[in-house]
């Protein structure tokens, strides 16, 4: 009954429910989990979104298309998609992950979305998988516009400082917590002529640096 409700939310009925069950299974819960599906789904998602952007923005150059795609397939965006389906309610997690609130964690939710995309592909083929991606992303694709906002925070901050002939920011990892497979990074960002030290957090060093750069952008009012 639970999977029936989820399939209605997804807008897709599986011929082989085993694919969906595996897509919902985190590595903490079973050896037959969604990691391989996530790997496959990531490729399908990138292709589907890339094709949609290529068709929607015929005048966009390669860099602009890449930045827009990155914004749509990043962890935070996938987590938004996951919450639309309330995926956390359907996932199978180990006791430790459940206790620590893994069903709310963006990294776990985003991986699950990618795994479900792969599950649809294995169940019904590439056309059906791409159709579901386009449906789930329809509003996000409609809202997508060319422009500065598609550049990641580090790039925007760097270009802002370079345009004013100021030194580039310095990033430093100040803390790492958690096991090797589930780490949280804390990074500081320092900008010359700004007294404040900005702190960012993320599941990788790169994500933490992006988060720190975003804090700088907000304070400096960079558009």
UniProtKB/Swiss-Prot annotation:
Gene3D superfamilies (UniProt xref): 3.30.160.20, Ribonuclease III domain (1.10.1520.10)
InterPro entries associated with the record: dsRBD_dom, RNase_III, RNase_III_dom, RNase_III_sf
Catalysis: reaction(s): Endonucleolytic cleavage to 5'-phosphomonoester
Main location as per UniProt: cytoplasm
SMART domains, alphabetized: DSRM, RIBOc
Keyword 4Fe-4S: no
Positions annotated to bind Mg(2+): 38, 111, 114
Gene Ontology biological-process entries: mRNA processing; regulation of gene expression; rRNA processing; tRNA processing
CDD domains (UniProt xref): DSRM_RNAse_III_family, RIBOc
Residues annotated as domain RNase III: 3-125
Any Gene Ontology CC annotation: cytoplasm
Cofactor field: Mg(2+)
Keywords for the protein's UniProt record, in alphabetical order: Cytoplasm, Endonuclease, Hydrolase, Magnesium, Metal-binding, mRNA processing, Nuclease, RNA-binding, rRNA processing, rRNA-binding, tRNA processing
Domain DRBM: 152-222
Annotated catalytic residues: 42, 114
Protein role: Digests double-stranded RNA. Involved in the processing of primary rRNA transcript to yield the immediate precursors to the large and small rRNAs (23S and 16S). Processes some mRNAs, and tRNAs when they are encoded in the rRNA operon. Processes pre-crRNA and tracrRNA of type II CRISPR loci if present in the organism.
Similarity section: Belongs to the ribonuclease III family.
Subunit text: Homodimer.
Protein name: Ribonuclease 3
Gene: rnc
